[in-house]
Amino acid sequence: MESKSGRFPFPFQPYPIQESFMEALYTALDQRKVGIFESPTGTGKSLSLICGALTWLRDYEEQRKQEAARLLEGQKDSDVVKEKNSNSGPPEPDWVSEFVQKKAERDMVNKLKDEELKRKKREERLEMIRHNAQLRYAMKRKADEDDEAVKLLQLSREGAEPETHSPEEEGLIVAEYESDDEATPKSRLCDDDNDDDDDLEEEHVTKIYYCSRTHSQLAQFVHEVQKSPYGDAVRLVNLGSRQNLCINPEVVRLGNVQMMNERCLEMQKNKHEKRQKASDSESKRSRGLAKATCVFSRFENLMAMKDEVLVKVRDVEQLIQHGRETHTCPYYSTRMSIPAAQVVVLPYQSLLHASTRKASGIKLKDQIVIIDEAHNLMDTISAIHSAEISGGQLCRAHSQLSQYCERYRSRLKAKNLMYIKQILFVLEGLVRTLGGKVGQNPNTQSCQTGSELLTINDFLFKAQVDNINLFKVQKYFEKSMISRKLCGFAEKYEGSGINTHSSSKNKENRRTEGLGRFLQTLQSKPTDVSEQQMAVEDKPIMASPMMLAESFLFALTNANKDGRVVIQRQACVAQSSLKFLLLNAAVHFAQILQECRAVIIAGGTMQPVADFKEQLLFSAGVTEERILEFSCGHVIPPENILPIVLCAGPSGQQLEFTFQTRDSPQMMEETGRVLSNLCNIVPGGVVCFFPSYEYEKRILGHWESTGILQRLQSKKKIFQEPKKASQVEQVLSEYSKCIQRCSNIGGGQTGALLFSVVGGKMSEGINFSDDLGRCIVMVGMPYPNIKSPELQEKMAYLDKHMPHVAGKSPGKALVESLCMKAVNQSIGRAIRHRGDYACIVLCDHRYARTGTLQKLPEWIRSSTHTHATFGPAFASARRFFLEKRQKATL
């Protein structure tokens, strides 16, 4: 089915707002705009993005084909004219410019011919794979045979003797380093010596990069593509981390993504070295076991799966299944598929972080980027480019590198030693800023508690490392891969003391045998069982803390005005930390905006957008003319939503949840009375949002002691949002079952009441559709902690670098925007489809201010009613649900 205009293929007749969305999207892509698109949850935003963007891409590719055909035809005509004029008189005086023009035309035609040839070869190859079932069966049979071979190889290794000491340690030593060497290392993947293979030189076709926050959101998008009219024809690649796509058991068992990355890269390096030394093995027999390599990254298999990935749209689970069936790495094959793909689906980190982007093989020049769920884009960019490291991790990194240097000193070149000593010097300075000393147990080193916030330059002076060129140190980290070497070194020697096989190395062994024991003493050991569980869940230990140190040092290369360093001193050095805070997100987003043909920033609730444009777009050099804004209403009729600003409670108490008044018994009891009255008239589920966990704990404690909680329990079964993400699904399931049970059997309880926290597990990404959320209650205004040093510094930065609007400082505007974005995310989950309905109650008289109301989404703002007293508000809510019940019985 197509839209009414006939322009956009769609799986069903689209709503008018979806047509408008796709038209605006098409215009933005065609005119190279930066688009800000707001489409509420439940309006089919994902499908509109898919059909609108892929329709433009289809038209663009067709236009390119026609232009190429015209140019090629014109070249033939030009050759005929050139033959006729070959015997004419002497050349014109401007023959040089004419020659240059003709050469440019010939080059363009040759490029077009080359592109057309590659395109035809690619399409023929994919078509053959798509329709040749016999070929697919042969590939699967070959994979099964390979699987048997792998099992036999593993069995043969089990009885083999361990590798001798020397060859194993060879891989831990950094290669000779030349700081001015700019040569790009060759790919570790290529097992084929044919460098002029067409596939390896494949150019990137025009494509759409779609990114979102979570893997579940990306999976949902892929499923929408599969169901769309483009599902069978589009070439889509689903990128993920090794944690999501790796199928090698030896790597997967590590669990931690950083450790998985290091092990995988080490295996690729071993394979590369194995190929280089293949000729030597014929004349000289190798002793011991070969270094571990990955059996899933054979080049010919990767090339085959690269094409298979493009033939059919697959989500992550399907990619893993296909990789296991063909014994081929999905992680690398998907990256090899990027050049020919039309759509690349990837998480935020892979797109927004320049180093990750480069490592993934992503090229943004003249491409389309769509960033979905972008309401917190600035915060996301800041978080990705911020870095934090604890005193314990700094001490571990220094200890590991010191003992690494001591062990291999005689085998390290002068340049390597120089840079390693510089890194040790910097780490020592960083520990010193926390009040500690390297070489001592950070758990027993006490320091004066407190926090300090410094500019980058002031921090470097304080650490006494301002004489070190961090840009050269950063380059050394990248070229030498010292963090990875150190990871292998720590893994080899962690635990009990070591004994090498060669007696001549006993002196060296003594230098490192205490490493494992010392590293174990550096790790804090919480005695409380729950603390231990939280430590395991939230802070997995990495084999090489040097990776964290590398990230922190890289962050310090930002411009002085763009970031700050927070020094947080706790009771001991191990628990103290250094945190780099990025203040200017635009500096890292500018490259994306400059390189891409068009950038689409989409979300369910993008309001307020003024600060977004000022801080992220204008600061990155985008002009107002390049920005296209689109905001649509909801698919629901206006009578299906009742937003209420409630200024006072049943007893006439004004509702104002400021820091000074929110803890008063009168305010907490009045809030309980508001909620109790609402629970008496609202069917199904009521979701109540509090501004913080701390306030939720205080008010629930007060309600329990005054009997309010018992009154609420008589009408609604009470559920509370868990603090652990792993328990969210269970609570939601029980909450949903309770509402369904009450709806079916009736009784005293009419549903359930869910207490949640703004910015918590339930306020984002969870849809309270139908009976799950018939009423959303927002208690107070969730302003961020104004006393936070990070927020204060961000406000000061904006006040200094951003213009004042309507007499309001940018810092104050930031605080209000953070508050209202959090509100919009929480209340925007109530309506999920056209037939859904809900009441939204904003409990605080400050919501009635004009400036605050303007920051609500338009589809909510246009229906909002402000009530100075409780009576009329309660009457309108009761009438709203009564009408819905009567309509349902008709």
Swiss-Prot record:
Alphabetical list of SUPFAM superfamilies matching this protein: P-loop containing nucleoside triphosphate hydrolases
Domain Helicase ATP-binding: residue ranges: 4-424
Cofactor: [4Fe-4S] cluster
Residue ranges, annotated region (Disordered): 71-95, 176-199
Pfam families assigned: DEAD_2, Helicase_C_2
Binding residue positions for [4Fe-4S] cluster: C246, C264, C294, C329
Highest taxon, organism lineage: Eukaryota
Motif position, DEAH box: 372-375
Composition skew (Basic and acidic residues), residue ranges: 71-85
Reaction equations catalysed: Couples ATP hydrolysis with the unwinding of duplex DNA at the replication fork by translocating in the 5'-3' direction. This creates two antiparallel DNA single strands (ssDNA). The leading ssDNA polymer is the template for DNA polymerase III holoenzyme which synthesizes a continuous strand; ATP + H2O = ADP + phosphate + H(+)
InterPro entries linked to this entry: ATP-dep_Helicase_C, DinG/Rad3-like, Helic_SF1/SF2_ATP-bd_DinG/Rad3, Helicase-like_DEXD_c2, P-loop_NTPase, RAD3-like_helicase_DEAD, Rad3/Chl1-like
Cofactor annotation comment: Binds 1 [4Fe-4S] cluster.
Location, primary (coarse class): nucleus
Effect of gene knockout: Morpholino knockdown of the protein leads to abnormal craniofacial and vertebrate development with shortened and twisted torsos, smaller eyes and low mouth positions at 3 days post-fertilization (dpf).
Compartment annotation: Nucleus; Nucleus, Nucleolus; Cytoplasm, Cytoskeleton, Spindle pole; Midbody
GO cellular component, one term: centrosome
Enzyme Commission number(s) of this protein: 5.6.2.3
Record keywords: 4Fe-4S, Activator, ATP-binding, Cytoplasm, Cytoskeleton, Developmental protein, DNA damage, DNA repair, DNA replication, DNA-binding, Helicase, Hydrolase, Iron, Iron-sulfur, Isomerase, Metal-binding, Nucleotide-binding, Nucleus, RNA-binding, Transcription, Transcription regulation
GO terms classed as biological process: DNA repair; DNA replication; establishment of sister chromatid cohesion; nucleolar chromatin organization; regulation of transcription of nucleolar large rRNA by RNA polymerase I; rRNA transcription
CDD domains: SF2_C_XPD
Binding site for ATP: S39, P40, T41, G42, T43, G44, K45, S46
GO MF: 4 iron, 4 sulfur cluster binding; ATP binding; ATP hydrolysis activity; DNA binding; DNA helicase activity; metal ion binding; RNA binding
Family stated for the protein in its record: Belongs to the DEAD box helicase family. DEAH subfamily. DDX11/CHL1 sub-subfamily.
General function of this protein: DNA-dependent ATPase and ATP-dependent DNA helicase that participates in various functions in genomic stability, including DNA replication, DNA repair and heterochromatin organization as well as in ribosomal RNA synthesis. Plays a role in DNA double-strand break (DSB) repair at the DNA replication fork during DNA replication recovery from DNA damage. Plays a role in the regulation of sister chromatid cohesion and mitotic chromosome segregation. Stimulates 5'-single-stranded DNA flap endonuclease activity of FEN1 in an ATP- and helicase-independent manner.
Protein name: ATP-dependent DNA helicase DDX11
Gene name, Swiss-Prot/TrEMBL: ddx11
